[in-house]
């Protein structure tokens, strides 16, 4: 192992602010109900539809990421503007498939039944898989389990649906009747494609929340630039130290 690798320190946890979206507050960091890892707020936005000329908001969505997402994404995407990232399909695919934990908090603005919510989510997931040519029996069974988890649930305004996506591909589902986040989930589905598709259906190319997509792009653009600047300062300090030692 080289001396530079031996001296490398873990990336600092990103310092971010909370976000207020349509009277819903997303705190700067949360503990994942799947792993208890701290995750930072990557972005937030609304999901709504234009109904008879009026934009109706159904849910407000926050996306949280593990701290190592920033250096991982920085390798390819640092220096890109918010606009460039927002328009980049590969960038959001890398977030969706990246080897770091993700967490999604979906807070209700209007009441929804579990059946209404889960059927729409799985419909979007299946559309993504078919587009990618990835729909198999395993995914069909994962969809059945997903629908079963939600079948008897109802979600009044202010309640939340929570998803934790592990780097290994499991999807942990949890529910909250208020703003709290439970320490553990109520069910785990071991299907990597389903876990990824749930997130992609929100922030991907045809995702249901363009506002969340824009928010994630804006925040990560800033964080990657900050990470780049800090790394350059750190590298310069190491070079100075080595020069003095020699």
UniProtKB/Swiss-Prot annotation:
Signal peptide start-end: none
Positions of substrate binding: 59, 124, 201
InterPro entries listed in its UniProt record: CFI, Chalcone_isomerase, Chalcone_isomerase_3-sand, Chalcone_isomerase_bundle_sf, Chalcone_isomerase_sf
A molecular-function term among this protein's GO annotations: chalcone isomerase activity
A Pfam family assignment: Chalcone
Family, as annotated: Belongs to the chalcone isomerase family.
Function noted in UniProt: Catalyzes the intramolecular cyclization of bicyclic chalcones into tricyclic (S)-flavanones. Responsible for the isomerization of 4,2',4',6'-tetrahydroxychalcone (also termed chalcone) into naringenin.
Listed name of the protein: Chalcone--flavanone isomerase 1
């Amino acid at each position: 192992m080289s001396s530079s690798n031996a001296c490398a320190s873990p990336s600092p946890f990103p310092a971010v602010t909370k976000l207020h979206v349509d009277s819903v507050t997303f705190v700067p960091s949360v503990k994942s109900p799947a792993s208890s890892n701290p995750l930072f707020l990557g972005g937030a936005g609304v999901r709504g539809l234009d109904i008879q000329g009026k934009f109706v908001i159904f849910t407000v969505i926050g996306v949280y990421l593990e701290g190592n997402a920033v250096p991982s994404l920085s390798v390819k995407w640092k220096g890109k503007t918010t606009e460039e990232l927002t328009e980049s399909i590969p960038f959001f695919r890398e977030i969706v498939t990246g080897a770091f934990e993700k967490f999604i908090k979906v807070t209700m603005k209007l009441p929804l039944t579990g059946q209404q919510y889960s059927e729409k989510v799985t419909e979007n997931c299946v559309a993504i898989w078919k587009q990618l040519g990835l729909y198999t029996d395993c995914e069909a069974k994962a969809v059945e389990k997903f629908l079963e988890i939600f079948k008897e649930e109802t979600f009044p305004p202010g309640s939340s649906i929570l998803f934790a996506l592990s780097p290994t591909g499991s999807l942990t589902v949890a529910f909250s009747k208020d703003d709290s986040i439970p320490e553990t989930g109520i069910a785990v589905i071991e299907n990597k494609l389903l876990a990824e598709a749930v997130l992609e259906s929100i922030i991907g190319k045809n995702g249901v929340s363009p506002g969340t997509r824009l928010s994630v792009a804006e925040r990560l653009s800033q964080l990657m630039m900050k990470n780049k600047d800090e790394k350059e300062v750190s590298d310069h300090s190491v070079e100075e130290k080595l020069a003095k030692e020699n």
